[in-house]
Every structure is written in structure tokens, then in C-alpha cells.
A protein has these predicted regions:
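Flexible loop/hinge segments at secondary-structure junctions
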Residues: 1-218
Length: 218
């Protein structure tokens, strides 16, 4: 996100974001011109998630290449409202936080299209849903142990979760998975299929379609 009065940023590449956010940028990348010579010599004021946030972990891994690897001279907050206020009040600001807060504050912010190697892609529900907004979109899962599922109340909750997730996710301005993802997970639950498609490792840039293909092989 940038300030809505920022007229020169239309899109940014992952490489440009890395140049700004990697630990070695601290004390060296201080203005927009330091990132791209075509941009003005205007001070960058950075805003982002705090180090205890899952958003921080994912952003640093997706952009810098290593989770929790980030420059430290930025305004960090677990409260996204603080980040919204900071970016909206500073013409030179750049920041990141969850999509839901952008939707709630669209008039105060300017979303920047990200080029992950296939051209700039705007952060829209459609682009997240079709898998093209990469690498900054990620799925969020729940995991349930086989032993826990022996408890009727846990099994009932998970079934409720899968059947009710889509409308509830929309209500809080997140983006639901495709319907077939929920039905597929209900089938796995009924058959007590165990395992994870990630094999115990974090992976960045996977689409839901790719994950579902892996899941079918469990």
C-alpha cells in the first residue's frame, strides 16, 4: 500500500520490494530514488506487521526469501488501524497488512499491483481467487489431530466450519476458497484422511488449484 497522493507508483516488482525490505537495506535504501532511479528523491516511510505476526512471517519469506528477515527501521504494529493511519497520513509511505483492512479503508489508501514475474497484478478478490496475485496471497488452514476427531464435539465443529466457512469468511472481508475445496475437505474428514500437502515445509506462491491437486494424492 502507498499513500493515495503517490502518483508515480503504479506497480512494483518483487525485486524492488526486496530491495526495500531486506535487512541490508537499512541505512542504505532511504528514498524512492534509491530503489528505482526513475522515481523521485523522496524519503520512504515504511509501515508493516510486527514480528510476532503471521503476516510478517509470510511477507518476509515471500519477498526477502527468508521468514523474519527484515530491516528493522520501520513502524511495526499488530494493529492494522495504526498502519492504515500511518500510510494515509504520509505521502512517502509504503506498507503492508491484511487485505481486509485495505477493503475497509480503500478511500484512504492506494493498492499497488505486484509483478511476480508475469506482469503487474492488482490485489483484487478476483486475482486472489484465480491464483494470479502471487506471491502475496496465501491460504489459511485449520489442522485437527486424529485423536481430537474422536471427540464428537470436535468433529461436529469441524463439519460446521467447513459448511459455514465461505459466507463467514466473506463477512470479515477475507476471500473464501473455491466451493470444491470445502467439499473435498469434508470428504477427507469423513474418510479420516491424514496428512498435509506441505510435507512439513513452508511454501510460497502456491495456488489453491495446485494445493487441491496435491491433496487429491493424499
Amino acid at each position: 500500500m502507498v499513500n493515495p497522493q503517490n502518483a508515480f507508483i503504479k506497480s512494483m516488482s518483487v525485486a524492488e520490494l526486496k530491495k526495500i525490505w531486506e535487512p541490508g537495506a537499512q541505512g542504505k535504501i532511504n528514498s524512492w530514488k534509491d530503489v528505482n532511479p526513475a522515481w523521485p528523491d523522496q524519503k520512504i516511510k515504511l509501515y508493516g506487521a510486527g514480528s510476532d505476526s503471521g503476516t510478517f512471517d509470510y511477507f518476509t519469506e515471500a519477498i526477502v526469501g527468508k521468514a523474519k528477515s527484515s530491516r528493522g527501521d520501520y513502524t511495526a504494529s499488530e494493529d492494522d488501524n495504526v498502519l492504515v493511519q500511518g500510510i494515509s497520513g504520509d505521502k512517502g509511505a509504503l506498507g503492508y497488512f491484511g487485505f481486509a483492512y485495505y477493503i475497509e479503508n480503500q478511500k484512504k489508501l492506494k493498492a499497488v499491483a505486484i509483478d511476480g514475474g508475469k506482469g503487474p497484478v492488482a490485489p483484487t478478490p478476483e486475482n486472489v481467487d484465480n491464483g494470479s496475485y502471487q506471491p502475496l496471497s496465501r491460504p489459511i488452514f485449520i489442522y485437527v489431530s486424529e485423536k481430537s476427531l474422536e471427540k464428537p464435539e470436535v468433529k461436529e465443529f469441524v463439519e460446521f466450519y467447513m459448511k459455514s466457512a465461505a459466507p463467514l469468511v466473506k463477512e470479515v472481508k477475507y476471500i473464501p476458497l473455491p466451493a470444491k475445496a470445502y467439499t473435498g475437505n469434508l470428504e477427507h474428514l469423513a474418510k479420516k484422511k491424514l496428512g498435509t500437502v506441505f510435507g512439513g515445509q513452508n511454501e510460497v506462491g502456491l495456488t489453491i488449484e495446485q494445493l487441491m491437486k496435491r491433496e487429491a494424492q493424499l
